[in-house]
UniProtKB/Swiss-Prot annotation:
Coiled coil: none
Catalytic activity: (6R)-5,10-methylene-5,6,7,8-tetrahydrofolate + glycine + H2O = (6S)-5,6,7,8-tetrahydrofolate + L-serine
Protein name: Serine hydroxymethyltransferase
Post-translational modification N6-(pyridoxal phosphate)lysine, affected residues: 225
Enzyme Commission designation: 2.1.2.1
Recorded name of the encoding gene: glyA
Entry-linked PANTHER family: SERINE HYDROXYMETHYLTRANSFERASE, SERINE HYDROXYMETHYLTRANSFERASE 1
Length: 417
């Protein structure tokens, strides 16, 4: 390996991370494992090329081959999600959201998004984020009775505040979202509807979660998470907004696009069109449902009583530990999750009363329902009966699962510390 000889410190860190991914159960809902083909595209010579502008309308010469790549990514994104227009240049989901806002909103305009404390995202109007600083953000949330989105509240807030844009989508909401209802509410006050489908994009591509594309003015997303691509973003819109969106991305919010990442996105979109990916998306949801059911059997409080997606939200208050403690305990056992606030959480975001658990990465490794049943029992034991003996047994079970479902065997044979 060239890197090993040139910079062993970086090489060793990469090798250690490969070993960590291989030897832990990755259950952070926003993480996944890309294919080697996607990594190959992202590590290609396209990283050398500047290509400001759009395909065939560049501000630099020598773009004939990167134009081919970006054209492929655009056409595949449109085909995959049945969209009229696609811009594949945003470097991230946050930048995709920023570009949409800046395309049709002015500073001080009112936006109505899901409360971060109830499962929304920073870029949907959180006060600590640019979206909450530039725009007048109002928040809808979930009902305390069942933790499902309160569409009646959304309607009342829309009528009261007359937002210029309503934002759908979430980072911690396990159930199906009624996009059509959101569009109905948006239309009632003359607002745009933007849906951030970052968490659900792979499930939507696989046909196991409702698509927001037809009913939304704008749809943004990341390409990692359930879509299993590189860490990046893209925007879908109606054709009437195409020019405004493209100008808002460049020169509005970004300079040169990352052509090596766009190549990886093109590969990602092609992979997501396959029958294998549809089966994968279905398995992700089935795994999450079984995981939720088994956790409930073990006395773990699963919010909303289950899931329709790739994630399971757990309220730990009946166990008497915080999300931070749970994250650390499971990490000691070899299971990676993240602490997560639950709706109406009395604890600060640095501690939280819950954790978020996801199945995309383990499903990529080939794990199915039987493995989810085993993992649910491990999680419950570690959370409820924390001891060195419990941890030791959990580590052994995790090791057995990881060895039975190896990750990146080709790389592991090449890279070792």
């Amino acid at each position: 390996m060239l890197l090993k000889a040139k910079d062993k410190e970086v090489y060793d860190a990469i090798a250690s991370e490969l070993n960590r991914q291989n030897s832990y159960l990755e259950m952070i809902a926003s993480e996944n494992f890309t294919s080697l083909e996607i990594m190959e595209a992202q590590g290609s010579v396209l990283t050398n090329k500047y290509a400001e502008g759009l395909p065939h309308k560049r501000y630099y010469g020598g773009c004939e081959y990167v134009d081919i790549v970006e054209d492929l990514a655009i056409q595949r994104a449109k085909e995959l999600f049945k969209a009229e227009h696609a811009n594949v240049q945003p470097h991230s989901g946050s930048q995709a959201n920023m570009a949409v806002y800046m395309a049709v909103l002015k500073p001080g305009d009112t936006i109505l998004g899901m409360s971060l404390a109830h499962g929304g995202h920073l870029t949907h109007g959180a006060t600590v984020n640019f979206s909450g600083k530039i725009y007048n953000a109002v928040y809808y949330g979930v009902r305390e009775s069942d933790y499902l989105i309160d569409y009646d509240q959304m309607y009342k807030l829309a009528k009261e505040h007359k937002p210029k844009m309503i934002i759908g989508g979430a980072s911690a909401y396990p159930r199906v979202i009624d996009w059509a209802k959101m569009r109905e509410i948006a239309d009632s006050v003359g607002a745009y509807l933007m849906v951030d489908m970052a968490h659900y994009a792979g499930l939507i591509a696989g046909g196991v979660y409702p698509s927001p594309v037809e009913v939304s003015h704008f749809v943004t997303s990341t390409t990692h998470k359930t879509l299993r691509g590189p860490r990046s973003g893209f925007i879908l819109s109606k054709q009437e907004f195409a020019k405004d969106i493209d100008k808002s991305v460049f020169p509005g919010t970004q300079g040169g696009p990352l052509m090596h990442v766009i190549a990886a996105k093109a590969v990602c979109f092609k992979e997501a069109m396959s029958d294998e990916f549809k089966q994968y998306a279905q398995q992700v949801v089935e795994n999450a449902r079984v995981l939720a059911e088994e956790l409930l059997k073990e006395g773990i409080n699963v919010l909303t009583g289950g899931t329709d997606s790739h994630m399971v939200l757990v309220d730990l208050r009946n166990i008497g530990i915080t999300g931070k403690e749970a994250e650390n305990r499971l990490g000691e056992a070899g299971i990676t999750v993240n602490k997560n606030a639950v709706p109406f959480d009395p604890l600060p975001p640095t501690k939280t009363s819950g954790i978020r658990i996801g199945t995309p990465a383990l499903t990529t490794r080939g794990m199915k329902e039987d493995q989810m049943k085993i993992i649910a029992k491990i999680i419950a034991k570690v959370l409820k009966n924390y001891s060195e003996d419990t941890l030791q047994k959990a580590r052994e079970q995790v090791k057995d699962l990881c060895e039975a479902f190896p990750l990146y065997k080709e790389l592991k044979d090449e890279i070792c510390v």
